[in-house]
């Protein structure tokens, strides 16, 4: 039973939210040498249950719409398989998704009391977009955009809770982190193209077609690297953040291979895995850039 719940929550994908919160925290620490650890823990808790909520509700609606009955499941695409295999009841997954949404909202409500209207706006956006993600947002072709905004909002919210400010640092840092998560969603939608299209979903891969979509693969990391490169050039981010460019070889290999393997699941699987690795490593290196710089400043 526990293993089924861990599968349906997609624990391995929660790392994207951990990285987003960590980036928000480390930007603030780099600037102030301070972290409110209680608020940091509550932020981690709130963001993770909200992330779990969207994955649970997505699995529920994909099953109800019959999408997950047609996909060829892999570790990164095609749904979790928990509902088609009968490991959990649809009602259980739906109720758990709503429960996690409520818990996340309660944690967010605490920060509304402490920090005011900015957190209220971010929380309302999060709750509405999470609940309607699988039934409205994806069908409108906005899934990748939503995930990018979600990552940005997590960094913004985390930074604001710590500093009571929204700054260029948190906005640009949030965009860099958000598009990395979008890249993972984008690449994992290739194998689901036919099943998603048949059931009315509109991912970027469906809108553009698989072949044209291979060129769009580069857009996400270009935005990420541009945010960080410009940030360093204008002293918004520390020079140490340039270590993110160490992941370029992984990206280039994935992008080149995708052009010839987008319709072959066997060849696409390692590209998907490497893209996930690229996204996580780049996010972690970005976070470490602030930590290295903060430690360096303390030693001066």
Positions of PLM-derived features:
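Small-residue-rich segments of transmembrane alpha-helices in multi-pass membrane proteins
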Residues: 18-24, 146-160, 177, 206-210, ...
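Helix-coil boundary and interhelical linker segments in multi-pass alpha-helical membrane proteins
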Residues: 25-45, 105-120, 155-175, 227-240, ...
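Extended hydrophobic alpha-helices typical of membrane-associated regions
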Residues: 233-298
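Multi-pass membrane catalytic core of lipid/isoprenoid biosynthesis enzymes
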Residues: 71-112, 205-237, 277-280
């Amino acid at each position: 039973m526990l293993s089924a719940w861990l599968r349906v929550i997609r624990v391995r994908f929660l790392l994207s939210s951990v990285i987003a919160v960590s980036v928000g925290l480390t930007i603030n620490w780099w600037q102030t040498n301070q972290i409110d650890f209680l608020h940091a823990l509550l932020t981690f808790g709130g963001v993770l249950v909200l992330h779990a909520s969207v994955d649970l509700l997505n699995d529920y609606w994909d099953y109800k719409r019959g999408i997950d009955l047609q996909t060829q499941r892999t570790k990164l695409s095609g749904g979790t398989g928990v509902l088609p295999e009968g490991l959990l009841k649809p009602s259980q997954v739906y109720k758990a998704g709503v429960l996690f949404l409520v818990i996340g909202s309660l944690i967010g409500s605490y920060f509304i009391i402490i920090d005011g209207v900015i957190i209220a706006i971010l929380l309302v956006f999060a709750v509405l977009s999470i609940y309607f993600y699988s039934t409205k947002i994806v069908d409108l072709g906005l899934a990748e955009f939503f995930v990018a905004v979600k990552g940005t909002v997590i960094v913004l919210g985390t930074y604001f809770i710590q500093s009571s400010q929204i700054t260029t640092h948190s906005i640009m840092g949030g965009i860099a982190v958000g598009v990395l998560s979008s890249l993972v969603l984008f690449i994992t939608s290739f194998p689901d193209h036919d099943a998603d299209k048949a059931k009315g979903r509109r991912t970027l891969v469906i809108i553009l077609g698989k072949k044209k979509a291979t060129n769009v693969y580069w857009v996400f990391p270009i935005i990420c690297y541009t945010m960080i490169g410009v940030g360093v050039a204008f002293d918004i981010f520390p020079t140490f953040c340039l270590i993110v460019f160490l992941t370029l070889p992984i990206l280039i290999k994935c992008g080149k291979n995708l052009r010839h393997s987008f319709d072959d699941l066997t060849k696409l699987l390692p590209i998907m895995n490497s893209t996930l690795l690229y996204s996580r490593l780049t996010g972690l290196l970005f976070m470490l850039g602030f930590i290295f710089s903060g430690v360096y400043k303390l030693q001066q």
